[in-house]
UniProtKB/Swiss-Prot annotation:
SUPFAM superfamilies: Triosephosphate isomerase (TIM) (SSF51351). It is found in: Cytoplasm. Its EC number is 5.3.1.1. It comes from Geobacillus kaustophilus (strain HTA426). Homodimer. This is Triosephosphate isomerase.
Length: 253
């Protein structure tokens, strides 16, 4: 049975004081790490303080993106070495907002995935279709292409450690969400792609999240699906009480 992973993506929200207070409020109340991986992915500026605040607890801290190079003339960027040095555990890569607003390509995402593994970070690799692609019946093809390109060059052992987040673009921040059955079908397709590329053991081990307007009142419907191993949550992860409801739902019944 795969351990579930519930990750909050704060995006560009909170002040440092608010972020630290959030961690102080939740860190003693998340489920044990051997039952659920509870993760907060915060803005770069907060990571150092949040890692310190969460130290010794079952709450893990993640970043929302990174550069693929260890160092260099990349003004404004943050490297995997810097994140690892801070004690960050996870990093979100290839989020649709990064792809749409900052021109990240599948090739760039792949470079970042490879760099994450080189530096001992666990990537949460995002994929998902637009509304137009969905209406054209291209969901499986689009997602399969994104996953195949993102994972290129990895070993089966590395793939087992990765996390994939299926986030249909049309469901992010819109209040609309895929049906649990639809999401399960796409996540199952992702697992079949991983099996074809890296073998059944890797496919059985890799964890696949659903994301897209996940809330405390619908998360259990998604987690009840066989192929869904967690959730990547935006707005509903910003309040301590809501976040704790989400991670508590991650326990296997």
């Amino acid at each position: 049975m795969r351990k579930r992973i519930i990750a909050g993506n704060w995006k560009m929200h909170k002040t440092l004081a608010e972020a630290v207070q959030f961690v102080e409020n939740v860190k003693g109340h998340v489920p044990p790490a051997d039952e659920v991986d509870s993760v907060v992915c915060a803005p770069f500026l907060f990571l150092d303080r949040l890692v310190q605040a969460a130290d010794g607890t079952d709450l893990k801290i993640g970043a929302q993106t990174m550069h693929f190079a260890d160092q260099g003339a990349y003004t404004g960027e943050v490297s995997p070495v810097m994140l690892k040095d801070l004690g960050v555990t996870y990093v979100i890569l290839g989020h649709s907002e990064r792809r749409q607003m900052f021109a990240e390509t599948d090739e760039t995402v792949n470079k970042k995935v490879l760099a994450a593994f080189t530096r001992g970070l666990i990537p949460i690799i995002c994929c998902g279709e637009s509304l137009e692609e969905r209406e054209a019946g291209q969901t499986n093809a689009v997602v399969a292409s994104q996953v195949e390109k993102a994972l290129a060059g990895l070993t089966p052992e590395q793939v087992k450690q990765a996390v994939i987040a299926y986030e249909p673009i049309w469901a992010i921040g819109t209040g609309k969400s895929s049906t649990p059955e639809d999401a399960n079908s796409v996540c199952g397709h992702i697992r079949s792609v991983v099996s074809r590329l890296f073998g059944p053991e890797a496919a059985e081990a890799i964890r696949i999240q659903y994301g897209g307007s996940v809330k405390p009142d619908n998360i259990r419907d998604f987690l009840a699906q066989e192929q869904i191993d967690g959730a990547l949550v935006g707005g509903a992860s910003l309040e301590p009480a809501s976040f704790l409801q989400l991670v508590e739902a991650g326990r296997h019944e």
